[in-house]
């Protein structure tokens, strides 16, 4: 994916970043208007190496079938599914786009990136079980979720997820829900297929080893992108009518260099993820489910524990997590100075406000980074009681940069999810944030 870069022409669109967001936007643009001049730039030596890489995310097709943080319980005891409906519809748009590519024979092996894996929610305790049943009843009335099943029966749970049910007694108060049509998605494999379509069908390859150093207004056209070829050390100034910054955690650092007022006040807080990954194939083959539970009362949504079947590189896998780590880097291949460089005068107050009003998050991160292998195994055993330490190893996942933005009441707040920041005229757009991320790529890129 390294056809020679043509720096002399004026482009209609430059996509910065070689992940699923840039791939989706570039492909939609070329499908709608094949004569558009599109340039894709990636700093690393291949695409889909950061957040889109298979092990760097959970691989869940986020459709709110099992993620309980999308269904808060109100003070009157009712369960709101407004956010769940929104997330589910957004993922359906992504599936429709991928189905279109399959029907047009642009993708010939969808099974290489998407498989059906049932999605479950599972909770312990009377209060949590009552909540899950209330959620089930509301879900059952909505067409997006009407295939949902619910049980408090241990025997039924054994048929759904035998490893979790193993070693438990009928006296334990538990509840679970299930939707069969859940998905497991290898976003790394998908991203590479999208870039392959762009290269083979539209002669629009991703140019790797290209580091974007600045984006400036241009006198002749809207924007000039300054970049460096990391192989030759050559520098280029390339002009484009539109620019999309989809560089994962590094998007914030690039946005801060762009001369638009909409960037003011944004900051970021990096959090790394870690998984426990099973090494025992006999154990792996006993579990065919994605099982999400509830985060602790003071823990952030990103801490929601889950026990998941994955398919990566043609092999079935089993993981548990996430566990949080801390690194000042905004990307796995980033710099230890990323966080420091991101602190500027206009976001100093929001960042301080976000820190001050999120002390429980700081406490949570401190507890997480001091965990050893047995501490993590103890967390796993809350799901899988008979888990043996020697069957599991730690794997470091991707970096996430949570959004910090101005807040009139608190000065600044930490925001989970993704956000699109655009100039008034829409000529430059930047995607910030994390989960549900890749699942909503098509919806988000259509809005861009």
Regions found by a protein language model. Give the residues of each.
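Core beta-strand elements of the Rossmann-like FAD/NAD(P) dinucleotide-binding domain
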Residues: 9-11, 231-242
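Flavin (FAD/FMN) cofactor-binding and adjacent substrate-gating region
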Residues: 108-117, 121-196, 200-201, 205-207, ...
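Beta1/beta-strand and adjacent pyrophosphate-binding region of the FAD-binding site
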Residues: 5-21, 39
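Flavin (primarily FAD) binding-site architecture
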Residues: 245-260
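Short beta-strand to alpha-helix junction loop
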Residues: 82-95, 123-130, 177-197, 207, ...
């Amino acid at each position: 994916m390294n056809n020679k870069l043509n720096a002399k022409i004026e482009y209609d669109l430059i996509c910065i970043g070689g992940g699923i967001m840039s791939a989706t936007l570039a492909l939609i643009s070329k499908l709608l208007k094949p004569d558009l001049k599109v340039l894709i730039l990636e700093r690393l030596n291949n695409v889909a190496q950061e957040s889109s890489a298979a092990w760097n995310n959970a691989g869940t097709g986020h459709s709110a079938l099992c993620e309980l943080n999308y269904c808060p319980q109100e003070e009157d005891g009712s369960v709101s599914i407004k956010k769940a409906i929104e997330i589910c519809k957004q993922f359906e748009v992504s599936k429709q786009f991928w189905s279109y590519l399959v029907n047009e024979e642009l993708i010939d092996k969808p099974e290489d990136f998407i498989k059906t894996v049932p999605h479950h929610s599972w909770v312990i305790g009377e209060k949590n079980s009552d909540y899950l049943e209330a959620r089930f009843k509301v879900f059952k009335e909505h067409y997006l979720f009407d295939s949902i099943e619910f049980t408090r029966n241990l025997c039924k749970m054994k048929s759904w997820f035998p490893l979790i049910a193993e070693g438990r007694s009928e006296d334990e108060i538990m509840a679970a829900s299930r939707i069969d049509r859940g998905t497991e998605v290898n976003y790394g494999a998908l991203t590479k297929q999208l870039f392959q379509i762009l290269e083979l069908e539209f002669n629009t390859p991703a140019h790797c080893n290209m580091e974007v150093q600045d984006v400036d207004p241009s006198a002749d056209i809207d924007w000039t992108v300054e970049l460096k070829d990391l192989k030759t050390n050559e520098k280029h100034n390339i002009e484009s009518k539109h620019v999309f910054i989809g560089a994962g955690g590094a998007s914030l650092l690039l946005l801060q260099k762009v001369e638009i007022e909409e960037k003011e006040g944004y900051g970021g807080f990096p959090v790394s993820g870690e998984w426990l990954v099973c090494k025992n194939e006999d154990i792996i083959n006993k579990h065919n489910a994605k099982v999400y539970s509830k985060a602790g009362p003071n823990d952030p949504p990103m801490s929601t524990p889950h026990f998941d079947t994955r398919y990566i590189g043609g092999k079935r896998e089993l993981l548990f997590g996430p566990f949080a780590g801390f690194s000042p880097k905004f990307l796995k291949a980033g710099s230890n100075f990323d966080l420091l460089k991101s602190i500027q005068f206009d976001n100093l107050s929001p960042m301080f406000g976000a820190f001050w009003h999120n002390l429980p998050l700081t406490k949570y991160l401190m507890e997480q980074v001091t965990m050893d292998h047995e501490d993590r195994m103890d967390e796993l055993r809350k799901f899988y009681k008979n888990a043996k330490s020697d069957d599991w190893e730690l794997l470091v996942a991707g970096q996430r940069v949570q959004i910090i933005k101005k807040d009139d009441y608190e000065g600044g707040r930490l925001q989970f999810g993704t956000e699109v920041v655009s100039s008034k005229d829409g000529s430059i757009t930047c995607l910030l944030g994390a989960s549900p991320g890749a699942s909503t790529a098509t919806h988000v890129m259509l809005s861009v």
